[in-house]
Every structure is written in C-alpha cells, then in structure tokens.
Amino acid sequence: MVPKLFTSQICLLLLLGLMGVEGSLHARPPQFTRAQWFAIQHISLNPPRCTIAMRVINNYRWRCKNQNTFLRTTFANVVNVCGNQSIRCPHNRTLNNCHQSRFRVPLLHCDLINPGAQNISNCRYADRPGRRFYVVACDNRDPRDSPRYPVVPVHLDATI
C-alpha cells in the first residue's frame, strides 16, 4: 500500500509540474504588459521573413511558437479598432471585449514547419502573406502602459 501511495503522489507531482510548464509556455514574459506583449508578437510595419521575425518571440518563450500573425500596421491603428463596437470573440467565445477592424490590412502569417526543433535557433517557418480583417480583444491599459491610450489591444483573436 505504501509504494502505491508514494507512486501516486509522485505521479500527481509530475502531472502538476507538467501542467505548470505547459501553462508557462503560453504565458507572456512578466516584464511586459499585455499590450506590450501584443505589440511585440503582432505589430510590424515591415516584418522580415517569418523565420527571422519569429526569433524575437521565440527568444522570450524559449521554444518555437507554432504559429503567429504579424499585422502590417501601427499600434495606434490597432488601438483605434478598440473603439469599434464590442463583439463576442470568435475564438474565445467567453470573451465579449473583441473588436473587428473595418478595413483589411496586409499581414504576414507564420507557420512552424519543423515542430520537432529542440533549439529555438533551429525554428523554421513558412511565410503566408495576406490581406485580411482582424479581431482584437481590448482592455483598459496597465499602469505600466503609456497613458496615451486608455484602452489597448491585448490579444489577436482572429483574422478574417
């Protein structure tokens, strides 16, 4: 009985540890506000090819992100979208703080093509340029954000 209890406790600890690691892989780096991390991940007027552009994000995450979209617009333009009518977020249906752009913007979507890469310097991506509408979730700014924008984008929910 004691070995079974001990084994089950170790399994539980391992499972909780793995869940913590998995959760941390999706978390933003603590030195950034949600709006700052949004800008790093999704705003670039002229992104280089995906493999190069994704290095910045992957260096903070310590792993190869499966996919990402860069909007070829300014942060101020995305902030303006936060002023559009609120809608239910298409991919996070529990959220009602999303807003859809009124105009298509050029974008660059990046897809990881070697998911087994063990080192972030080996992450390789396929480039998929396009022109689409986008949906962002917006929240009140963090005290660490610029007071210039009281409401800021914090999540790219969809491109349409």
UniProtKB/Swiss-Prot annotation:
Organism the protein comes from: Pan troglodytes
GO CC terms in record: extracellular space
Signal peptide extent: 1-27
Active site residues of this protein: H42, H155
InterPro entries: RNaseA (IPR001427), RNaseA-like_dom_sf (IPR036816), RNaseA_AS (IPR023411), RNaseA_domain (IPR023412)
Assembly with partners or alone: Interacts with bacterial lipopolysaccharide (LPS) and lipoteichoic acid (LTA). In vitro interacts with phospholipid bilayers.
Catalytic class of the enzyme: hydrolase
Protein's UniProt name: Eosinophil cationic protein
This protein's encoding gene: RNASE3
